[in-house]
Amino acid sequence: AYAGNLAVTTTSGPGLSLKSEAMGLAVMAELPLVVVDVQRGGPSTGLPTKTEQSDLNQALFGRNGECPMAVIAAHSPAHCFDAAFQAAKIALEHMTPVMLLSEGFLGNGSEPWKIPSMKDYPEIKPPFVQGILPEGEKFRPFERDPETLVRRWALPGQRGFEHRVGGLEKNHAGVLSTDPANHALMVAERAEKVARIARDLPVLTMQHGPASGALLVVGWGGTFGHILTAVREIGAAVTESSLIIRHP
């Protein structure tokens, strides 16, 4: 990712724990990374061939320090493609690692799927630096876009944009800093940057039932089909039931 490309890795089970340090580094360095976690029964080696949704809390919170990440969950075998595209777009445009949750049920599942045309998908626009710096001006790698709080992405070898990244805290100029006030500022900016990703997400839509009613069922991930079936079956008894699938 430091060299100017999206970094992607996949894992399952305790492999996610082993990658937590690298994810923290990507959060601190603010570089695009997608981690795909095909969840299985745990803990430890657990049930390698059986499905589970037990990694959600680790995906949301399983890193040291204040280390927020975007998390997306696929809900069907076909949806894995769109979820992966969304994860890549978020990572590249917001300069952040993203966790994509799948699970054994989806990994071993199948369904008819029409291969899409990429022209039907929105353009991905990474925040690469453009042009050259004015004479005497130094590149400040952690200065942010005022709307998105995303930093600019300078590639190694770009003249005038030399800078350092790494796991140590830095200020906006990219200089190492242990100043408490600067640390508080950078922690807050990184968290708010991730929170503002929600501005670019589509509005949630009702998958079944009326837009309002007495009962709302919320689910996530591969339980989508089961929940949808259950809501449809109880629809005769609970006429105001609705289903919405929320991607964390």
Residue ranges and their predicted role:
Residues 1-61, 70-91, 236:
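Thiamine diphosphate
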Residues 83, 88-248:
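Flexible, low-complexity linker and terminal segments
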